[in-house]
Amino acid sequence: MGVGAHHDAPECGMENVEWRMKTGTDTVRAHHDAPTSHTESTPQGPIMRIVSLLPSATEIVCALGLEKELVGVTHECDFPPFVRQLPKVTRTLIPTEASSRAIDELVRERLTTQRALYSLDLPNLEALKPDLIVTQALCDVCAVAEEEVRAAACLLPGTPKVINLEPQTLTEVLASIQQVGAAVGISSHADNIVAQLTARVEAVSARTAGLQHRPRVALLEWLDPPFSCGHWSPELVRLAGGVEGLGKEGQPSRTLRWEEVLSWNPEGVLIACCGFDIERTLEDVPALWKVPGWLDSAACRSGQVYVVDGSQYFSRPGPRLVDSLEMLAHALHPETHPLPDGLDPAFRIAVPHF
């Protein structure tokens, strides 16, 4: 389902609601430590109390210049940095300190038995008195389920408006910014933000148009077990001048066998584990060297294996997805794509030689 496929008004009238979660200046660049800057004029929309239930929505709200209207966020919202101080209305029920294999097994088991991955703090949500709640229905693993949020909204005073973000592609990610802008009455301002982001995407695409060689790329969203990338990420690889042969544009990520990865023989590997920063991802990397045939892959032989902050970038469908594109383009074609000021490069791993 695409962006805006669900109605804004929560479907109320339910009785005996069971709380079960079946399971994120003129140039917009969100990798600074201050709240994202916005265009010339401050958006003039109605004062609202906004609660964001996914990190990408939090970044969208702030990119639109609505930092002061944001009153509540999730336990995972961490950018811009000031949002870490806002009241939290969710918590995870999965031990994040567990191994990647254990996390994967726990998530699969809970989804199979329809047990919660997250809990929603209804008393805190009620105390925040939101006018607008931004949620998602894209991924059962990434955030509180949309139907759970709509059920909660029906129990809150005033029945706040609920909007659902469900982007599958980069175009739909940018459209979700306009969706939030329309919900708060600043459509024109949102259009300006999207135009700026689109110009950056087009600049990358223009530079890749004349490339003589597009390397085979494996963008991995998990390592144990390995997962392909999905949704917008294969599109990012294409726009950055690569070819993604394991993930499909606009489709969910999927579990892989290492034999599949090695059969693709990627010339470049980008590891962007969903929900993990670089430090946490690096804990899993040594196991790669033990995968039979891995060190003989084209990427390892040429030293083109990178780790990025998957939590902050590639798996967060907000304004910084364009940063992700620029980061990826620089990693694949550094001479063609200079790294923009203020954006850290992908971390290149030293491949061991046994």
Question: Where would I find each of the regions flagged by the language model?
Answer:
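Extreme N-terminal basic, low-complexity initiation segments
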Residues: 1-9, 14
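Detector for intrinsically disordered, low-structure N-terminal pre-sequences
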Residues: 2, 16, 27, 44, ...
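N-terminal ligand-binding lobe of clamshell/alpha-beta domains
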Residues: 41-354
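Short, basic, low-complexity termini and linkers enriched in Ser/Thr/Gly/Pro
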Residues: 11-22, 31-45
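Intrinsic, low-complexity polybasic segments
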Residues: 5, 25-26, 30
